[in-house]
Amino acid sequence: MMSANTVAKVMIIMLAVCLLTQTDGKPVRKRAVSEIQLMHNLGKHLASMERMQWLRRKLQDMHNFVSLGVQMAARDGSHQKPTKKEENVLVDGNPKSLGEGDKADVDVLVKSKSQ
């Protein structure tokens, strides 16, 4: 067995080591500025990629809509009527054609043009 003197010395040494290091459960070293900048850049990159994927999906939806043969309105504000009713069908298969809008739809379109 160890004597009480030896146990006391070991306890004092361990107490000194614990008090002098003062880690308190924190990381031993702080992150360097370059690591923080790297994490910031990674976050910005991921957000940018997410926005690009969202935009790509929206553009793909628009491309699919246009590729069905639906004629778009001219930029000068005049509207073109499609030649055939089959060309005027919505993408999701809704039988209501684009030319046959509800009164609420027409009101929304008129309000959006005035802005």
Curated annotation (Swiss-Prot):
Signal peptide: 1-25
Pfam families with a match to the protein in the record: Parathyroid (PF01279)
Compartments where located: Secreted
Residue numbers spanned by region Important for receptor binding: 51-69
Keyword terms, alphabetized: Cleavage on pair of basic residues, Hormone, Secreted, Signal
Keyword Signal carried by entry: yes
Function statement: Parathyroid hormone elevates calcium level by dissolving the salts in bone and preventing their renal excretion. Acts by binding to its receptor, PTH1R, activating G protein-coupled receptor signaling. Stimulates [1-14C]-2-deoxy-D-glucose (2DG) transport and glycogen synthesis in osteoblastic cells.
Family per record: Belongs to the parathyroid hormone family.
Protein name as it appears in the record: Parathyroid hormone
Name of the coding gene: Pth
